[in-house]
Amino acid sequence: MRFLLTYCLLLFSLPIAAATEDVFSRFQDRLVQIRILEASTGAQAGVGSGFFASSRGLIVTNYHVISDLILHPQHYRAEVVTTDGQRAPLQLIDFDAVHDLAVVQTQLPPRRAFEMHTTNPPIGMRLFSIGTPLDLGFTIVEGTYNGLLEASLYEKIHFTGSLNPGMSGGPAVLRNGQVVGVNVATAGNQVSFLVPARFVRALLLRAQNLHGLTPKAALAQLRDQLNANQNAYMQRLIDTPVTSTSLGHYRVPNKLAPFIKCWGDSKAEPTQRYQQVVQECSSEDNLYVSRTHTTGVIQFQHQWLSTRALNRFQFYSVYQEQFNANYPGIPASADDVSQYACHTDFVQSHNVRFKVALCLRANKRLPGLYDAVLKAATLNENHGGVLTTLVLAGVSANNALRFSQHYLESFRWNP
């Protein structure tokens, strides 16, 4: 019986293996590896995947694969390597940083191109993801289409398959070779994500009459794309009524939008003479700018502190120390952002009195965009209060101010 079961499983796996091999053999000439090279030495600094997507020879990949060409054009160059070993320098034609896509071109003769699938496949449809994982050569991974992610700010396809570093920018195709999405990220354990093909079609349509971007034009385009994107989602947040939840003696902002997730915890050390309840919320749709810089972050944290063991002066000392504590930062280097500049004030919103500090730092390469940190402490009680911290990355100063006000106006004191 055991032998029969093993034999049946082997027979079942043969058609799957044959299908995978068939897909790769039919479409491998349309694939490329993209190598990012240090300009002065030619040493490899990064690797990704791509594929021919037009009769003109346009190649699609991820924005994050080629971002060094935009942010550090004097330090990096790039080349493509085809499956038959041909190499050629590439030129950046266009990109969509919000959806992590880019179009490049080489001087190689145009090859057969992949076609884009025009509808969403049924849930459970088999997909074949192709790329160059860990610089180990071209590899095909079979997986399953599981539809679009729910509660996500940006459309992504949930792909059940194992994507690895180096596969970014490669296609995920149906058995007929039509592209359903572009490999973009993984959460491990066969949970991976694809950029839907409709965004590829839109970018290719825009790129078909373009002939390349200078570094200056590319950087300006990056700034414009991120600025337009933050205006759109910040307006959406400001226009959405804030839901609230109880924390201590207050009503505090809870889930600001479907794409924001929240969780809570309580902390009470045996030697600690005050109680602490923490609620944290964040989006999971951060945007990649460069290997040192992340933007699009939306995070906030509430802490309810209360005590029966401390007098008002002792509690205020603890409260002030917590208010001054640093909140985990937004990933960025000193080359990416300036130092924070802060303004502190006392304000009242409805029946809540606050001490408020609003800090901004400028994005050096993306003028007009800032990272903002709002810290506020309620001042209505002598032995309890809420400390709240709001973090926004890559927003305009005006949107930081508008949303900070919108956020604070949602607090209520319920003594």
Predicted regions span which residues?
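A conserved glycine-rich beta-strand in the N-terminal activation segment of trypsin-fold
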Residues: 19-20, 37-56, 88
